[in-house]
Amino acid sequence: MKNRILVLLTVVALVVVMLAPVALAITKQCWASPCYGTNKDDTLYEHPRFNNKIYALRGDDIIRPALWRIRPAPDTDILRGGPGNDRLKSDDLDGRDVLYGGRGRDVCIINRGDRTRGCEKVGR
């Protein structure tokens, strides 16, 4: 019986060690800046009350304006896609944001006054 328990605990420990470095894709509201995604396909939301620096990292990511907004916030957000086909949206009505597409085919949705770099497609 003790041998079975020891074998079971060893197997569990090996599985935990093997799965520990695996990062899962996330969907999250960024509550601090800078805010980082993972190397998977993430969805990140900016915070409406302060200047955001959001880094999507690898994967086909989406960066969007905040989940809620009472009125346009005069903040300057920096949104950075990473390697992958990212969708960066800064249509938060302030026109002061900077979007960097990164490697891959990136789509940037902006307001008048926002700036882009490395976006293969730019729209409003």
Placement of each model-derived feature along the sequence:
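Acidic glycine-/aspartate-rich tracts in secreted/extracellular proteins
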Residues: 94, 113-114
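Glycine-centered beta-turn/loop sites at beta-strand termini
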Residues: 37, 46-48, 56, 65, ...
